[in-house]
Protein backbone atom coordinates (compact mmCIF):
# COMPACT_ATOMS: atom_id res chain seq x y z
CA UNK A 1 0.00 0.00 0.00
CA UNK A 2 1.42 3.37 -1.05
CA UNK A 3 1.21 5.91 1.76
CA UNK A 4 2.94 8.79 3.52
CA UNK A 5 5.91 7.01 5.05
CA UNK A 6 7.17 9.88 7.20
CA UNK A 7 5.92 13.24 8.43
CA UNK A 8 8.70 15.54 9.64
CA UNK A 9 9.19 18.99 11.14
CA UNK A 10 12.39 21.03 11.39
CA UNK A 11 13.35 24.32 13.04
CA UNK A 12 16.26 26.71 12.76
CA UNK A 13 18.09 26.88 16.07
CA UNK A 14 20.20 30.07 16.50
CA UNK A 15 22.99 28.05 18.09
CA UNK A 16 22.86 24.73 16.23
CA UNK A 17 21.43 25.74 12.86
CA UNK A 18 18.80 23.54 11.13
CA UNK A 19 17.54 20.81 13.48
CA UNK A 20 15.03 18.00 12.93
CA UNK A 21 12.32 18.69 15.50
CA UNK A 22 9.86 15.80 15.22
CA UNK A 23 9.66 12.67 13.11
CA UNK A 24 6.66 10.39 12.76
CA UNK A 25 6.91 7.46 13.00
CA UNK A 26 9.95 7.71 15.25
CA UNK A 27 11.05 4.15 14.58
CA UNK A 28 10.26 3.47 10.96
CA UNK A 29 12.03 1.23 8.50
CA UNK A 30 15.09 3.45 8.82
CA UNK A 31 14.74 5.96 11.61
CA UNK A 32 17.69 8.33 11.07
CA UNK A 33 16.45 11.23 8.93
CA UNK A 34 18.27 14.03 10.74
CA UNK A 35 20.28 14.86 7.61
CA UNK A 36 17.06 16.23 6.07
CA UNK A 37 17.04 19.30 8.34
CA UNK A 38 19.63 21.12 6.18
CA UNK A 39 17.54 20.47 3.06
CA UNK A 40 14.23 21.37 4.69
CA UNK A 41 15.58 24.82 5.64
CA UNK A 42 17.44 26.08 2.54
CA UNK A 43 19.68 29.13 2.22
CA UNK A 44 18.01 32.56 2.59
CA UNK A 45 14.88 30.91 3.96
CA UNK A 46 14.32 33.86 6.31
CA UNK A 47 13.76 36.20 3.35
CA UNK A 48 10.26 34.84 2.65
CA UNK A 49 7.22 34.20 4.79
CA UNK A 50 6.73 30.85 3.08
CA UNK A 51 8.33 28.66 0.44
CA UNK A 52 8.24 25.14 -0.98
CA UNK A 53 10.81 22.59 -2.03
CA UNK A 54 10.79 19.07 -3.42
CA UNK A 55 13.70 16.64 -3.42
CA UNK A 56 14.58 12.94 -3.49
CA UNK A 57 16.17 10.64 -0.94
CA UNK A 58 17.25 7.04 -1.38
CA UNK A 59 16.73 4.03 0.84
CA UNK A 60 19.41 1.36 0.80
CA UNK A 61 18.03 -2.11 1.42
CA UNK A 62 21.54 -3.37 2.14
CA UNK A 63 22.41 -0.91 4.90
CA UNK A 64 18.81 -0.15 5.91
CA UNK A 65 19.38 3.62 5.92
CA UNK A 66 18.20 6.69 4.02
CA UNK A 67 20.69 8.89 2.17
CA UNK A 68 20.63 11.90 -0.09
CA UNK A 69 22.91 10.04 -2.49
CA UNK A 70 22.17 6.73 -4.16
CA UNK A 71 25.00 4.26 -4.64
CA UNK A 72 26.01 5.29 -8.16
CA UNK A 73 28.53 2.46 -8.47
CA UNK A 74 25.91 -0.13 -7.66
CA UNK A 75 22.82 1.14 -9.46
CA UNK A 76 20.26 -1.51 -10.22
CA UNK A 77 18.82 -0.55 -13.59
CA UNK A 78 15.67 -2.55 -13.11
CA UNK A 79 12.89 0.07 -12.99
CA UNK A 80 11.69 0.32 -9.40
CA UNK A 81 10.51 3.14 -7.16
CA UNK A 82 10.96 1.10 -4.00
CA UNK A 83 14.33 2.64 -3.16
CA UNK A 84 13.59 6.27 -4.09
CA UNK A 85 11.40 8.54 -1.99
CA UNK A 86 9.90 11.93 -2.80
CA UNK A 87 10.02 14.63 -0.14
CA UNK A 88 7.62 17.60 -0.32
CA UNK A 89 8.57 20.39 2.05
CA UNK A 90 6.81 23.59 3.14
CA UNK A 91 8.80 26.35 4.85
CA UNK A 92 7.42 29.10 7.10
CA UNK A 93 9.14 32.15 8.59
CA UNK A 94 7.68 34.17 11.46
CA UNK A 95 8.73 37.66 12.47
CA UNK A 96 8.87 37.90 16.26
CA UNK A 97 10.11 41.13 17.82
CA UNK A 98 12.61 40.77 20.61
CA UNK A 99 13.84 37.30 19.60
CA UNK A 100 17.28 36.39 18.36
CA UNK A 101 17.54 36.89 14.60
CA UNK A 102 14.19 38.70 14.72
CA UNK A 103 12.01 35.62 14.33
CA UNK A 104 11.89 31.88 13.77
CA UNK A 105 11.87 29.51 10.80
CA UNK A 106 10.02 26.18 10.58
CA UNK A 107 9.50 23.46 7.98
CA UNK A 108 7.21 20.45 7.59
CA UNK A 109 7.78 17.66 5.07
CA UNK A 110 6.13 14.48 3.89
CA UNK A 111 8.24 11.57 2.65
CA UNK A 112 6.59 9.05 0.32
CA UNK A 113 7.03 6.83 -2.73
CA UNK A 114 3.96 8.51 -4.26
CA UNK A 115 5.29 10.14 -7.48
CA UNK A 116 2.66 12.92 -7.58
CA UNK A 117 3.68 14.25 -4.18
CA UNK A 118 3.54 17.83 -5.50
CA UNK A 119 -0.24 17.49 -5.78
CA UNK A 120 -0.44 17.14 -1.99
CA UNK A 121 0.54 20.78 -1.35
CA UNK A 122 -2.95 21.75 -0.07
CA UNK A 123 -2.82 18.77 2.28
CA UNK A 124 0.58 19.72 3.66
CA UNK A 125 -0.51 23.35 3.93
CA UNK A 126 -3.47 22.43 6.11
CA UNK A 127 -1.43 19.96 8.14
CA UNK A 128 1.02 22.74 8.97
CA UNK A 129 -1.79 25.04 10.13
CA UNK A 130 -3.12 22.33 12.45
CA UNK A 131 0.34 21.50 13.77
CA UNK A 132 1.25 25.16 14.26
CA UNK A 133 -1.75 25.65 16.55
CA UNK A 134 -0.55 22.80 18.78
CA UNK A 135 3.07 21.87 17.96
CA UNK A 136 3.80 18.48 19.49
CA UNK A 137 4.75 14.95 18.51
CA UNK A 138 1.21 13.88 19.45
CA UNK A 139 -0.31 16.29 16.93
CA UNK A 140 2.13 15.16 14.26
CA UNK A 141 1.29 11.52 14.94
CA UNK A 142 -2.44 12.16 14.59
CA UNK A 143 -1.88 13.98 11.30
CA UNK A 144 0.27 11.12 10.00
CA UNK A 145 -2.51 8.68 10.85
CA UNK A 146 -5.08 10.84 9.02
CA UNK A 147 -2.86 10.96 5.93
CA UNK A 148 -2.67 7.21 5.72
CA UNK A 149 -6.38 6.51 5.71
CA UNK A 150 -5.93 6.63 1.93
CA UNK A 151 -4.08 4.36 -0.47
CA UNK A 152 -2.29 6.88 -2.68
CA UNK A 153 -1.69 4.33 -5.41
CA UNK A 154 -5.41 4.34 -6.16
CA UNK A 155 -5.22 7.98 -7.24
CA UNK A 156 -3.59 7.30 -10.58
CA UNK A 157 -4.13 4.70 -13.27
CA UNK A 158 -1.79 1.81 -13.86
CA UNK A 159 -1.10 2.38 -17.52
CA UNK A 160 1.78 1.37 -19.75
CA UNK A 161 4.19 4.13 -20.74
CA UNK A 162 2.78 4.09 -24.28
CA UNK A 163 -0.78 4.55 -22.97
CA UNK A 164 0.36 7.39 -20.72
CA UNK A 165 2.06 9.08 -23.67
CA UNK A 166 -1.08 8.82 -25.77
CA UNK A 167 -3.05 10.69 -23.11
CA UNK A 168 -0.27 13.18 -22.32
CA UNK A 169 0.69 14.17 -25.87
CA UNK A 170 -2.76 14.50 -27.42
CA UNK A 171 -5.27 17.27 -26.85
CA UNK A 172 -8.32 15.24 -27.83
CA UNK A 173 -10.94 17.87 -27.05
CA UNK A 174 -9.47 20.43 -29.45
CA UNK A 175 -9.99 17.88 -32.24
CA UNK A 176 -13.58 17.22 -31.26
CA UNK A 177 -14.97 20.69 -30.59
CA UNK A 178 -17.56 20.22 -33.33
CA UNK A 179 -18.72 16.88 -31.92
CA UNK A 180 -18.87 18.27 -28.39
CA UNK A 181 -20.83 21.34 -29.45
CA UNK A 182 -23.36 19.60 -31.66
CA UNK A 183 -23.56 16.09 -30.21
CA UNK A 184 -22.06 15.79 -26.72
CA UNK A 185 -23.36 12.22 -26.43
CA UNK A 186 -20.87 11.06 -29.07
CA UNK A 187 -18.02 11.24 -26.60
CA UNK A 188 -19.87 8.92 -24.23
CA UNK A 189 -19.75 6.25 -26.92
CA UNK A 190 -16.04 6.54 -27.63
CA UNK A 191 -14.49 7.04 -24.20
CA UNK A 192 -14.22 3.95 -22.02
CA UNK A 193 -13.24 3.40 -18.42
CA UNK A 194 -9.52 3.95 -19.06
CA UNK A 195 -10.11 7.65 -19.59
CA UNK A 196 -13.13 8.22 -17.37
CA UNK A 197 -11.22 10.87 -15.45
CA UNK A 198 -11.28 13.22 -18.43
CA UNK A 199 -13.82 16.01 -17.75
CA UNK A 200 -17.06 15.25 -19.60
CA UNK A 201 -18.63 17.80 -21.92
CA UNK A 202 -21.44 19.79 -20.34
CA UNK A 203 -23.27 22.98 -21.16
CA UNK A 204 -19.98 24.70 -21.95
CA UNK A 205 -17.20 23.54 -24.24
CA UNK A 206 -14.32 22.08 -22.23
CA UNK A 207 -10.76 22.53 -23.47
CA UNK A 208 -8.65 19.49 -22.54
CA UNK A 209 -4.94 20.07 -22.15
CA UNK A 210 -2.06 17.90 -20.92
CA UNK A 211 -2.82 18.93 -17.32
CA UNK A 212 -6.51 18.04 -17.46
CA UNK A 213 -6.11 14.32 -16.79
CA UNK A 214 -6.71 14.70 -13.07
CA UNK A 215 -8.71 13.12 -10.29
CA UNK A 216 -9.89 14.75 -7.09
CA UNK A 217 -9.26 13.29 -3.65
CA UNK A 218 -10.72 14.63 -0.42
CA UNK A 219 -8.82 14.08 2.81
CA UNK A 220 -10.01 14.51 6.36
CA UNK A 221 -7.26 15.73 8.69
CA UNK A 222 -8.10 15.22 12.33
CA UNK A 223 -5.90 16.26 15.26
CA UNK A 224 -6.31 17.99 18.62
CA UNK A 225 -10.08 18.54 18.31
CA UNK A 226 -9.69 19.94 14.81
CA UNK A 227 -11.21 18.36 11.72
CA UNK A 228 -10.42 19.83 8.34
CA UNK A 229 -11.39 18.60 4.87
CA UNK A 230 -8.89 19.16 2.08
CA UNK A 231 -9.32 18.48 -1.64
CA UNK A 232 -6.27 17.74 -3.79
CA UNK A 233 -6.25 17.56 -7.58
CA UNK A 234 -4.01 14.63 -8.49
CA UNK A 235 -2.80 13.68 -12.00
CA UNK A 236 -4.32 10.40 -13.16
CA UNK A 237 -1.33 9.38 -15.26
CA UNK A 238 2.34 9.12 -14.38
CA UNK A 239 5.23 9.79 -16.77
CA UNK A 240 8.59 8.57 -15.41
CA UNK A 241 11.23 11.28 -14.79
CA UNK A 242 8.52 13.97 -14.89
CA UNK A 243 8.19 14.92 -11.22
CA UNK A 244 6.38 17.98 -9.90
CA UNK A 245 4.54 20.74 -11.71
CA UNK A 246 7.30 21.13 -14.26
CA UNK A 247 7.18 23.46 -17.23
CA UNK A 248 9.67 22.53 -19.92
CA UNK A 249 8.44 25.44 -22.02
CA UNK A 250 9.35 27.88 -19.22
CA UNK A 251 12.81 26.30 -18.85
CA UNK A 252 13.48 26.63 -22.58
CA UNK A 253 12.04 30.13 -22.79
CA UNK A 254 14.35 31.26 -19.96
CA UNK A 255 17.62 30.19 -21.62
CA UNK A 256 16.95 29.94 -25.36
CA UNK A 257 18.03 33.53 -26.10
CA UNK A 258 21.09 33.52 -23.83
CA UNK A 259 24.67 34.25 -24.97
CA UNK A 260 27.17 31.58 -26.00
CA UNK A 261 27.88 29.13 -23.15
CA UNK A 262 31.54 28.94 -24.27
CA UNK A 263 32.52 32.56 -23.58
CA UNK A 264 35.07 31.56 -20.90
CA UNK A 265 36.66 28.78 -22.97
CA UNK A 266 38.75 28.50 -26.13
CA UNK A 267 35.83 26.82 -27.90
CA UNK A 268 34.12 29.10 -30.42
CA UNK A 269 31.15 26.89 -31.22
CA UNK A 270 28.03 28.81 -32.19
CA UNK A 271 25.43 26.62 -30.54
CA UNK A 272 22.28 27.45 -28.63
CA UNK A 273 22.37 27.14 -24.80
CA UNK A 274 19.45 24.68 -24.91
CA UNK A 275 21.46 22.28 -27.07
CA UNK A 276 24.38 22.59 -24.65
CA UNK A 277 22.13 21.82 -21.68
CA UNK A 278 20.61 18.75 -23.36
CA UNK A 279 24.00 17.43 -24.43
CA UNK A 280 25.51 17.92 -20.98
CA UNK A 281 22.63 16.05 -19.35
CA UNK A 282 22.72 13.27 -21.95
CA UNK A 283 26.40 12.52 -21.40
CA UNK A 284 26.18 12.84 -17.59
CA UNK A 285 28.15 16.00 -16.98
CA UNK A 286 27.88 18.00 -13.75
CA UNK A 287 25.03 20.45 -14.34
CA UNK A 288 24.28 23.07 -11.70
CA UNK A 289 21.35 25.50 -11.50
CA UNK A 290 21.96 28.60 -9.40
CA UNK A 291 19.72 31.38 -8.10
CA UNK A 292 20.62 34.15 -5.66
CA UNK A 293 17.20 35.80 -5.61
CA UNK A 294 14.49 33.28 -6.53
CA UNK A 295 12.70 30.98 -4.10
CA UNK A 296 13.52 27.34 -3.42
CA UNK A 297 10.33 26.34 -5.25
CA UNK A 298 11.40 28.18 -8.42
CA UNK A 299 14.83 26.54 -8.23
CA UNK A 300 13.28 23.08 -7.83
CA UNK A 301 11.00 23.68 -10.82
CA UNK A 302 13.98 24.46 -13.07
CA UNK A 303 15.94 21.42 -11.92
CA UNK A 304 12.97 19.06 -12.24
CA UNK A 305 12.07 20.54 -15.64
CA UNK A 306 15.62 19.81 -16.82
CA UNK A 307 15.28 16.23 -15.62
CA UNK A 308 12.07 15.91 -17.63
CA UNK A 309 13.73 17.64 -20.61
CA UNK A 310 16.51 15.09 -21.05
CA UNK A 311 14.02 12.25 -20.63
CA UNK A 312 12.54 13.42 -23.91
CA UNK A 313 9.82 15.15 -21.88
CA UNK A 314 8.00 11.83 -21.82
CA UNK A 315 10.08 9.31 -19.89
CA UNK A 316 11.81 8.12 -23.06
CA UNK A 317 15.12 8.15 -21.17
CA UNK A 318 15.10 7.29 -17.48
CA UNK A 319 17.54 7.15 -14.60
CA UNK A 320 18.55 10.79 -14.18
CA UNK A 321 16.39 11.22 -11.06
CA UNK A 322 18.89 9.01 -9.22
CA UNK A 323 21.47 11.80 -9.50
CA UNK A 324 19.09 14.79 -9.38
CA UNK A 325 19.10 17.16 -6.41
CA UNK A 326 16.50 19.95 -6.72
CA UNK A 327 18.22 21.65 -3.79
CA UNK A 328 21.58 20.99 -2.20
CA UNK A 329 23.72 23.03 0.21
CA UNK A 330 27.40 23.45 0.96
CA UNK A 331 27.35 20.75 3.63
CA UNK A 332 26.88 18.14 0.86
CA UNK A 333 29.39 19.50 -1.67
CA UNK A 334 32.08 16.95 -0.90
CA UNK A 335 29.78 14.04 -1.73
CA UNK A 336 28.24 15.85 -4.70
CA UNK A 337 31.48 16.57 -6.56
CA UNK A 338 32.58 12.94 -6.23
CA UNK A 339 29.74 11.92 -8.54
CA UNK A 340 30.74 11.46 -12.21
CA UNK A 341 27.71 13.55 -13.16
CA UNK A 342 24.73 15.19 -11.51
CA UNK A 343 21.85 17.65 -11.93
CA UNK A 344 21.52 19.95 -8.91
CA UNK A 345 20.11 23.26 -7.71
CA UNK A 346 21.85 25.65 -5.31
CA UNK A 347 21.13 29.03 -3.72
CA UNK A 348 24.58 29.86 -2.37
CA UNK A 349 26.67 32.19 -4.61
CA UNK A 350 29.85 30.45 -3.39
CA UNK A 351 29.30 27.86 -6.13
CA UNK A 352 30.07 30.45 -8.82
CA UNK A 353 33.62 30.75 -7.51
CA UNK A 354 34.32 27.01 -7.77
CA UNK A 355 34.26 26.10 -11.46
CA UNK A 356 35.84 22.77 -10.54
CA UNK A 357 32.58 21.79 -8.83
CA UNK A 358 30.53 21.90 -12.04
CA UNK A 359 30.80 21.45 -15.80
CA UNK A 360 27.78 23.53 -16.82
CA UNK A 361 26.30 26.36 -14.73
CA UNK A 362 22.76 27.56 -15.43
CA UNK A 363 22.23 31.00 -13.87
CA UNK A 364 18.48 31.43 -13.44
CA UNK A 365 18.67 35.09 -12.40
CA UNK A 366 20.74 36.17 -15.42
CA UNK A 367 19.19 33.59 -17.78
CA UNK A 368 22.59 32.33 -18.93
CA UNK A 369 24.28 28.95 -19.33
CA UNK A 370 28.06 28.74 -18.89
CA UNK A 371 30.49 25.90 -19.59
CA UNK A 372 33.32 25.61 -17.07
CA UNK A 373 36.77 26.50 -18.39
CA UNK A 374 38.18 23.84 -16.05
CA UNK A 375 36.59 21.21 -18.24
CA UNK A 376 39.26 21.84 -20.85
CA UNK A 377 42.34 22.32 -18.65
CA UNK A 378 45.19 19.82 -18.82
CA UNK A 379 45.14 19.48 -15.04
CA UNK A 380 41.57 18.30 -14.78
CA UNK A 381 40.69 16.74 -18.12
CA UNK A 382 41.78 13.54 -19.84
CA UNK A 383 42.61 13.52 -23.54
CA UNK A 384 39.39 11.64 -24.24
CA UNK A 385 37.31 14.36 -22.63
CA UNK A 386 39.29 17.09 -24.39
CA UNK A 387 38.64 15.47 -27.77
CA UNK A 388 34.97 15.30 -26.83
CA UNK A 389 34.80 19.08 -26.52
CA UNK A 390 37.13 20.37 -29.25
CA UNK A 391 36.58 20.20 -33.00
CA UNK A 392 35.11 16.72 -32.67
CA UNK A 393 33.05 17.79 -29.68
CA UNK A 394 29.36 16.89 -29.32
CA UNK A 395 28.84 20.63 -28.81
CA UNK A 396 30.60 21.66 -32.04
CA UNK A 397 28.28 21.79 -35.06
CA UNK A 398 28.90 20.54 -38.58
CA UNK A 399 26.68 21.46 -41.46
CA UNK A 400 24.08 18.65 -41.33
CA UNK A 401 23.94 18.29 -37.56
CA UNK A 402 23.93 22.05 -37.14
CA UNK A 403 20.94 22.23 -39.47
CA UNK A 404 19.09 19.70 -37.33
CA UNK A 405 19.88 21.67 -34.18
CA UNK A 406 18.88 24.95 -35.81
CA UNK A 407 15.57 23.46 -36.98
CA UNK A 408 14.99 22.14 -33.45
CA UNK A 409 15.55 25.59 -31.91
CA UNK A 410 13.46 27.26 -34.63
CA UNK A 411 10.58 24.88 -33.91
CA UNK A 412 10.85 25.51 -30.17
CA UNK A 413 10.65 29.27 -30.71
CA UNK A 414 7.52 28.79 -32.81
CA UNK A 415 5.85 26.46 -30.31
CA UNK A 416 6.61 28.79 -27.39
CA UNK A 417 4.13 31.21 -28.96
CA UNK A 418 1.34 28.62 -29.25
CA UNK A 419 -1.64 28.38 -26.89
CA UNK A 420 -0.86 24.74 -26.13
CA UNK A 421 2.87 25.43 -25.92
CA UNK A 422 3.75 22.92 -23.19
CA UNK A 423 2.31 19.95 -25.09
CA UNK A 424 3.90 21.02 -28.39
CA UNK A 425 7.29 21.70 -26.79
CA UNK A 426 7.26 18.31 -25.07
CA UNK A 427 6.42 16.59 -28.34
CA UNK A 428 9.24 18.39 -30.17
CA UNK A 429 11.76 17.60 -27.43
CA UNK A 430 10.68 13.96 -27.58
CA UNK A 431 11.35 13.89 -31.34
CA UNK A 432 14.79 15.43 -30.78
CA UNK A 433 15.83 12.86 -28.15
CA UNK A 434 14.22 10.09 -30.20
CA UNK A 435 16.29 11.02 -33.25
CA UNK A 436 19.47 10.96 -31.13
CA UNK A 437 18.67 7.45 -29.86
CA UNK A 438 17.86 6.18 -33.34
CA UNK A 439 21.09 7.60 -34.78
CA UNK A 440 23.00 6.01 -31.89
CA UNK A 441 21.36 2.69 -32.80
CA UNK A 442 22.56 3.05 -36.40
CA UNK A 443 26.03 3.96 -35.14
CA UNK A 444 26.30 0.86 -32.96
CA UNK A 445 25.03 -1.43 -35.70
CA UNK A 446 27.40 0.01 -38.32
CA UNK A 447 30.61 0.38 -36.33
CA UNK A 448 30.16 -2.03 -33.40
CA UNK A 449 28.20 -4.68 -35.36
CA UNK A 450 25.56 -5.00 -32.63
CA UNK A 451 23.32 -2.60 -30.75
CA UNK A 452 22.08 -2.97 -27.16
CA UNK A 453 19.75 -0.08 -28.06
CA UNK A 454 17.95 -2.46 -30.42
CA UNK A 455 18.84 -6.10 -29.74
CA UNK A 456 16.21 -7.37 -32.19
CA UNK A 457 17.16 -5.71 -35.49
CA UNK A 458 19.11 -8.69 -36.88
CA UNK A 459 16.02 -10.89 -36.52
CA UNK A 460 13.48 -8.39 -37.90
CA UNK A 461 10.91 -9.92 -40.21
CA UNK A 462 10.74 -6.58 -42.00
CA UNK A 463 14.17 -5.02 -42.45
CA UNK A 464 15.18 -1.44 -41.74
CA UNK A 465 15.90 0.28 -38.42
CA UNK A 466 17.47 3.30 -36.73
CA UNK A 467 17.64 6.58 -38.63
CA UNK A 468 16.95 7.06 -42.32
CA UNK A 469 19.45 8.98 -44.50
CA UNK A 470 19.26 9.92 -48.17
CA UNK A 471 22.50 8.06 -48.96
CA UNK A 472 25.25 6.01 -47.33
CA UNK A 473 27.90 8.76 -47.52
CA UNK A 474 25.70 11.14 -45.57
CA UNK A 475 25.00 8.40 -43.03
CA UNK A 476 28.67 7.53 -42.43
CA UNK A 477 29.76 11.18 -42.23
CA UNK A 478 27.14 12.12 -39.65
CA UNK A 479 27.71 9.01 -37.53
CA UNK A 480 31.48 9.55 -37.51
CA UNK A 481 31.00 13.14 -36.43
CA UNK A 482 28.58 12.16 -33.65
CA UNK A 483 30.71 9.21 -32.50
CA UNK A 484 32.25 11.01 -29.46
CA UNK A 485 28.80 12.01 -28.29
CA UNK A 486 27.46 8.47 -28.72
CA UNK A 487 30.44 6.96 -26.91
CA UNK A 488 30.01 9.41 -24.03
CA UNK A 489 26.31 8.58 -23.78
CA UNK A 490 27.07 4.86 -23.79
CA UNK A 491 28.72 5.36 -20.37
CA UNK A 492 25.73 7.22 -18.92
CA UNK A 493 23.05 5.77 -16.66
CA UNK A 494 20.25 6.82 -19.03
CA UNK A 495 21.80 4.67 -21.79
CA UNK A 496 22.08 1.60 -19.57
CA UNK A 497 18.56 2.04 -18.26
CA UNK A 498 17.16 2.42 -21.79
CA UNK A 499 18.91 -0.77 -22.95
CA UNK A 500 17.59 -2.69 -19.96
CA UNK A 501 14.00 -1.56 -20.50
CA UNK A 502 14.09 -2.36 -24.21
CA UNK A 503 15.49 -5.81 -23.47
CA UNK A 504 12.54 -6.41 -21.11
CA UNK A 505 9.90 -4.91 -23.43
CA UNK A 506 6.94 -7.18 -24.09
CA UNK A 507 5.32 -5.34 -27.02
CA UNK A 508 5.35 -7.97 -29.81
CA UNK A 509 5.82 -5.59 -32.75
CA UNK A 510 9.15 -4.35 -31.31
CA UNK A 511 10.64 -7.73 -32.15
CA UNK A 512 9.31 -7.70 -35.73
CA UNK A 513 9.99 -4.25 -37.19
CA UNK A 514 11.10 -0.70 -36.39
CA UNK A 515 7.83 1.20 -36.63
CA UNK A 516 9.41 4.63 -36.09
CA UNK A 517 11.86 4.06 -38.94
CA UNK A 518 9.18 3.06 -41.42
CA UNK A 519 6.68 5.75 -40.36
CA UNK A 520 9.42 8.31 -41.03
CA UNK A 521 9.98 6.81 -44.46
CA UNK A 522 6.28 7.18 -45.22
CA UNK A 523 6.26 10.77 -43.93
CA UNK A 524 9.53 12.10 -45.29
CA UNK A 525 10.93 9.97 -48.09
CA UNK A 526 10.14 9.85 -51.79
CA UNK A 527 9.12 6.22 -51.80
CA UNK A 528 8.25 4.13 -54.79
CA UNK A 529 4.80 2.57 -54.80
CA UNK A 530 6.49 -0.80 -54.23
CA UNK A 531 8.38 0.38 -51.13
CA UNK A 532 5.28 2.06 -49.73
CA UNK A 533 3.27 -1.10 -50.36
CA UNK A 534 5.78 -3.19 -48.42
CA UNK A 535 5.56 -0.86 -45.42
CA UNK A 536 1.76 -0.79 -45.35
CA UNK A 537 1.56 -4.58 -45.67
CA UNK A 538 4.14 -5.04 -42.90
CA UNK A 539 2.26 -2.69 -40.57
CA UNK A 540 -0.97 -4.60 -41.08
CA UNK A 541 0.81 -7.91 -40.65
CA UNK A 542 2.69 -7.11 -37.43
CA UNK A 543 0.42 -4.67 -35.55
CA UNK A 544 -1.94 -7.15 -33.96
CA UNK A 545 -2.20 -6.79 -30.19
CA UNK A 546 -3.49 -3.96 -28.02
CA UNK A 547 0.12 -3.23 -26.99
CA UNK A 548 1.11 -3.00 -30.66
CA UNK A 549 -1.61 -0.45 -31.38
CA UNK A 550 -0.64 1.50 -28.25
CA UNK A 551 2.93 1.72 -29.50
CA UNK A 552 1.81 2.81 -32.97
CA UNK A 553 -0.47 5.53 -31.57
CA UNK A 554 2.25 6.82 -29.24
CA UNK A 555 4.27 7.58 -32.38
CA UNK A 556 1.37 9.26 -34.20
CA UNK A 557 0.32 12.28 -32.08
CA UNK A 558 -2.67 14.16 -33.42
CA UNK A 559 -0.85 17.48 -33.79
CA UNK A 560 1.65 15.84 -36.17
CA UNK A 561 -1.00 14.31 -38.40
CA UNK A 562 -2.22 11.40 -36.31
CA UNK A 563 -3.26 8.45 -38.45
CA UNK A 564 -3.07 10.37 -41.73
CA UNK A 565 0.26 8.68 -42.46
CA UNK A 566 -1.57 5.33 -42.30
CA UNK A 567 -4.69 6.56 -44.12
CA UNK A 568 -2.52 7.56 -47.07
CA UNK A 569 -2.39 3.85 -47.92
CA UNK A 570 -6.13 3.91 -48.66
CA UNK A 571 -5.24 5.58 -51.98
CA UNK A 572 -2.48 3.18 -53.06
CA UNK A 573 -2.71 1.80 -56.59
CA UNK A 574 -2.71 -1.77 -55.26
CA UNK A 575 -6.05 -3.20 -54.20
CA UNK A 576 -4.19 -5.55 -51.83
CA UNK A 577 -2.56 -2.61 -50.04
CA UNK A 578 -5.84 -0.69 -49.79
CA UNK A 579 -7.51 -3.70 -48.20
CA UNK A 580 -4.61 -4.20 -45.78
CA UNK A 581 -4.69 -0.56 -44.67
CA UNK A 582 -8.46 -0.77 -44.28
CA UNK A 583 -8.07 -3.83 -42.04
CA UNK A 584 -5.43 -2.03 -39.96
CA UNK A 585 -7.71 0.98 -39.52
CA UNK A 586 -10.53 -1.37 -38.48
CA UNK A 587 -8.22 -2.77 -35.82
CA UNK A 588 -7.29 0.72 -34.65
CA UNK A 589 -10.89 1.93 -34.66
CA UNK A 590 -11.89 -0.74 -32.14
CA UNK A 591 -8.96 0.10 -29.84
CA UNK A 592 -9.76 2.06 -26.66
CA UNK A 593 -7.66 5.07 -27.72
CA UNK A 594 -7.51 4.33 -31.43
CA UNK A 595 -11.16 5.26 -31.87
CA UNK A 596 -10.27 8.83 -30.87
CA UNK A 597 -7.44 8.96 -33.40
CA UNK A 598 -9.72 7.49 -36.05
CA UNK A 599 -12.36 10.17 -35.49
CA UNK A 600 -9.67 12.84 -35.93
CA UNK A 601 -9.08 11.74 -39.55
CA UNK A 602 -10.54 14.04 -42.17
CA UNK A 603 -13.93 13.20 -43.66
CA UNK A 604 -12.47 12.12 -47.01
CA UNK A 605 -10.21 9.53 -45.36
CA UNK A 606 -13.06 8.17 -43.24
CA UNK A 607 -15.42 8.03 -46.25
CA UNK A 608 -12.78 6.24 -48.31
CA UNK A 609 -12.21 3.74 -45.52
CA UNK A 610 -15.94 3.08 -45.20
CA UNK A 611 -16.22 2.64 -48.97
CA UNK A 612 -13.34 0.13 -49.13
CA UNK A 613 -14.88 -1.80 -46.25
CA UNK A 614 -18.24 -1.93 -48.00
CA UNK A 615 -16.70 -3.08 -51.28
CA UNK A 616 -14.77 -5.79 -49.48
CA UNK A 617 -17.95 -6.92 -47.74
CA UNK A 618 -19.85 -7.05 -51.05
CA UNK A 619 -17.18 -9.27 -52.59
CA UNK A 620 -17.31 -11.62 -49.61
CA UNK A 621 -21.11 -11.78 -49.75
CA UNK A 622 -21.06 -12.55 -53.47
CA UNK A 623 -19.14 -15.79 -52.95
UniProtKB/Swiss-Prot annotation:
Keywords: Cytoplasm, Nucleus. Disulfide bonds: none annotated. GO terms for biological process: actin cortical patch localization; establishment of cell polarity. GO terms for cellular component: cell cortex; cytosol; nucleus; plasma membrane. Residues 5-204 form the uDENN domain. Residues 388-476 form the dDENN domain. It is found in: Cytoplasm, Cell cortex; Nucleus. Pfam families: Afi1 (PF07792), SPA (PF08616). Residues 248-386 form the cDENN domain. Belongs to the AFI1/mesA family. This is AFI1-like protein C776.06c. It comes from Schizosaccharomyces pombe (strain 972 / ATCC 24843).
Amino acid sequence: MMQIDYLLTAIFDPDRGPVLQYQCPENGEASDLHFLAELMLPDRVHERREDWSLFFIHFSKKSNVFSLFSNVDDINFEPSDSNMYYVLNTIRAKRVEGTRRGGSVFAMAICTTFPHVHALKPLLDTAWEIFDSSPSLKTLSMLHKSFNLHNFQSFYQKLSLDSSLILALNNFWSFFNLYLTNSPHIMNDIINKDIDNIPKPGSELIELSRDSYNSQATFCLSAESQERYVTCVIPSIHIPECVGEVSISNLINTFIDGPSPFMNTDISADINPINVLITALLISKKVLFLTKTSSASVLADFVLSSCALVSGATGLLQGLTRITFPYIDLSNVESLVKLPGYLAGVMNPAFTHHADWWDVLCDIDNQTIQVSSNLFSDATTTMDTKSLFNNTSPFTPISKDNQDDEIFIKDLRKFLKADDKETLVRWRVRLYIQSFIRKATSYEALFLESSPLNPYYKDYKFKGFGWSWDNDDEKVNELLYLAPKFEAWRQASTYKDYCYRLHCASTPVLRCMDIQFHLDRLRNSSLSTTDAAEIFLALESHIRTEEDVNYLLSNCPLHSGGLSVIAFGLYHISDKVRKAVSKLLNRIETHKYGKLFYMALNKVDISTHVYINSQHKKKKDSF
